[in-house]
């Protein structure tokens, strides 16, 4: 797992390591839902799979992505449907995501994760350190991204976002 792992020169040279890691996270999360370092992607995946504590109830590896080029943290935006058909709810933002799926061509569906007690104003989040991580929950707000646009992924410790 990770950048360059298992690659043979000339084979799969275009494989994106961010894409590869996120694909591994999706596989691990799907295994849990249907049934080194203290903090790393590998550790978070192992925790999620119960390799360190079986039956731990964890279901998500939260991730922060960094844009290629400027290497700045990526902030996603979205909104729930409003109360009536054809209406849009309040715009929300997050630097922290749950990976829902990754396609063969490295597009991913990401769900915004937020602490429901954290203010939802999009302007107050200037970088990931401004975002509360104490009680992250799934929002149901998903975005689609091209993983070739990212150069780095930070995995936070595995958590449970589903009851």
PLM features: what roles do these ranges have?
Residues 1-163:
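Short glycine-rich, low-complexity segments
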């Amino acid at each position: 797992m990770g950048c360059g792992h298992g690659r043979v020169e000339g084979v799969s040279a275009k494989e994106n390591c961010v894409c590869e890691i996120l694909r591994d996270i999706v596989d691990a999360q799907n295994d849990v839902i249907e049934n080194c370092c203290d903090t790393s992607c590998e550790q978070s995946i192992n925790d999620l799979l119960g390799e360190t504590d079986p039956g731990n109830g964890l279901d998500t590896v939260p991730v922060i992505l960094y844009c290629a080029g400027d290497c700045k943290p990526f902030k996603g935006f979205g909104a729930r449907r409003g109360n009536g058909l054809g209406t849009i709810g309040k715009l929300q933002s997050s630097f922290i995501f749950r990976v829902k799926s990754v396609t063969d061509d490295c597009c991913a569906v990401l769900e915004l994760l937020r602490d429901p007690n954290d203010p939802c104003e999009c302007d107050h989040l200037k970088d990931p350190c401004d975002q509360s991580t104490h009680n992250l929950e799934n929002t149901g707000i998903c975005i689609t991204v091209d993983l070739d646009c990212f150069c780095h992924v930070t995995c936070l410790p595995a958590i449970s976002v589903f009851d």
